[in-house]
Design a protein with these regions (language model features):
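Long C-terminal interaction/binding lobes of large macromolecular proteins
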Residues: 1-284
Length: 284
């Protein structure tokens, strides 16, 4: 029997197109609703409560659940390239709470707080949708093909980085000798180095060497471990620059004249964080 209340269920509020156009997703992880677009539903009451749960936000499980709920075409948000993340979260925010958003920012020089209204549709339009370039030419006969970082990869990297930073603080504040601290710091540094290299290895799809295409993970891992630092820097710089595609631009804030007279700049840029509960707070 069909629920007689189903006509009151939430319906798609907007549709979005992804910066990646659906590339780099795992098989079966994405189903477009119409012509390379995805429908976005408003958040449910449960979704809003999830986005205000600090524990769930810490490991990104709240964000994953909300994306599954509001953008059901993304069947596996963990495999979503981070390039698409800002577009998806902006879409959920607009569908749920509207196109405008009030934020508070601290004005440089005078250190005073002002409120500012952001047009999220404009921010969506300003997102860089340039095509991801997967190729890094290291030498005329050596080219590395990379992929965007996935949301799972980003989350794991953030959690592991946070854990190492927390350990640095604990060691610095701990009651141990200087030599013991140096030993602990060296171990933490080694783990951070391995974390960076592991992240790079995960981002490499294949390597073309003298016309031979190598996709074997073991060979790729050995190459990353043994290549010269200049090559590693080139790969890392390329991946970082390409992963920045799809990001929202900082907000340009106009400063009130009275604050400018006190020494504040006429305008300044302010970043807007999307992947946290503040972005999804409903006005009371």
């Amino acid at each position: 029997m069909v629920n007689p209340l189903n006509k009151y269920f939430r319906k798609p509020a907007i549709s979005i197109s992804l910066p990646t156009q659906g590339e780099f997703y795992a098989p079966g992880a994405l189903t477009f609703d119409n012509d390379k677009e995805l429908n976005v539903f408003p958040m449910t009451a449960r979704d809003e409560m999830m986005m205000n749960s600090p524990d769930a936000l810490m490991n990104s499980s709240a964000t994953i659940d909300v994306i599954k709920s509001c953008v059901p075409g993304i069947r596996d948000p963990w495999s979503m390239p981070v390039i698409d993340l800002d577009t998806v979260l902006l879409g959920v925010r607009i569908a749920s709470l509207g196109e405008s958003m009030d934020i508070s920012v601290i004005v440089p020089k005078v250190e005073e707080t002002i409120s500012y209204t952001v047009d999220l549709r404009v921010m969506m339009d300003q997102i860089d949708r340039s095509q991801f370039n997967p190729y890094v030419v290291l030498e005329p006969t050596l080219t590395v093909k990379v992929k965007p970082m996935s949301y799972r990869q980003l989350t794991n990297l953030q959690l592991r980085t946070y854990e190492q930073q927390r350990m640095i603080t604990q060691v610095a504040q701990g009651k141990m000798s200087a030599s013991e601290k140096n030993k602990e710091f060296n171990e933490i540094f080694n783990r951070m180095t391995n974390l960076t290299l592991d992240n790079m290895k995960e981002g490499v799809l294949e390597i073309n060497a003298d016309g031979d295409v190598i996709t074997e993970n073991t060979y790729i891992s050995e190459f990353v471990d043994n290549m010269q630092a200049e090559m590693a820097s080139k790969i890392r710089t390329h991946i970082d620059s390409q992963n920045s595609l799809g990001k929202i631009k900082p907000i340009t804030v106009q400063v009130p004249e009275d604050m400018v007279k006190k020494g504040a700049p006429t305008t300044f840029g302010s970043p807007l964080s999307l992947d946290n509960s503040n972005f999804f707070v409903r006005k009371s």
